[in-house]
Amino acid sequence: MPTIGFHAQHEQAHPRDLRDSAVHAEQAGFDAVMCSDHLAPWSRRQGHSGLTFAWLGAALQATERVPMGCFHAPGQRYHPVISAQAFATLAAMFPGRFPWVALGSGEALNEHVTGDPWPTKDVRMARLRECVDVMRALWRGEEVSHRGLVTVDRARVWSLPDEPPKLVAGAVSAETAAWAAEWADGLITVNQPPDLLRRVAGAYRDAGGRGELHLQVHLSWARDDDAALAAACETWRSNCLPTSLAWELETPEQFEAATRHVPPEE
């Protein structure tokens, strides 16, 4: 049986309201909750972007049973030692209820704030791979030093869970899915035409990928189709951009400019 979860979209709601939505999702019978991890929304109309670490602690405390996971991009805005410590703390405080983190190479929208250069995709993927090794070593209780695309000097995470979260790969393309198969504990991707989804999942499995497959499905709910379409156009035009462009834009204003003329049917 598939697990049907609720996506807590930080970019669209005040953190307090989003916490309450997670409670309502559990009460309504959803099997899980996941959330985004952005510093900025994709548009000013969306209007919010709470801190995932803080929100997850509050949401896990406010609910009773549903497991939760999140997207995350270590390596620039987040140092992997801080990522490892934060997720270890959540997993230790809520045993069995923080089972996975979905890792990606990030977007300039969130990462440019450090002032560091925004790397090319291949460098970001290599940096992510280093972060995976650093985080897992810390969760094994090791003291870690590392010199590469990220630097770590004698770090240790002292409060560890009995079971650390799985590191799931976020991938949109078949190429990235195949690359992630070597290290990932599972795969998460987003809704695309069925033939593309089969290619992504097949590439992951063919490359030896293990674990569960997760699919994030975007939908717009309203009392009639016209209202649902209007709501989607108002807040989610950014979904129409190719990922190769979306990764590079740095501000909500740039996303708005790039999608200003997207027609509703797209």
Predicted feature residues:
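Active-site-adjacent structural elements that line small-molecule/cofactor binding pockets in enzymes
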Residues: M1-E266
